[in-house]
Amino acid sequence: ESDLIILVGANPRFEATMLNSRIRKNYIKNKTEIYSFGDIGDLTYPYKVIENNTRIIKDIVDNDHDLSKKIINSSKPLIIVGQSILKIKSGKYIFEELKNFLTSNDKINNEWNSLNVLSNHASTVGSYDLGIFSSEDGRNLTLEKVKNNKCEVIFLFGQDDLKFKKKK
């Protein structure tokens, strides 16, 4: 449905192939404009490269960039933020500024949410839903409980990125 797609630290071809195929289908069918912060290689559809710099986000949210008007004039813009962006020092700033800009321009509402996060692992979203990870600072709350002997039993289903040290 989207008529404008912006990738911020996301590479859907490698991180979410189904999403990438839907973006491609949308491009072929609707000639959707697609932008990416930085050149992320062949996505199987054309996209315009934006300088990979946090300053550009500030320019966009301050209405000092060409993309500002495109987002505002778009009926259903889609901004996809890669999970890796949220881990950098300016990650929270980037996410919050985009969220505030989109909310103030009615691009996040009951009908459409323009701001999306592309998770690195399928299990990550479920981990947030179950309260295993803190969405505020990314801490592994369950692992903290285990270290403090506050859990009797733990089932690990699809925890792709947990690292355990072997005890000798």
Positions of predicted regions on the chain:
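Extended redox/cofactor-interaction regions of prokaryotic respiratory oxidoreductases
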Residues: 1-22, 26, 35-75, 80-168
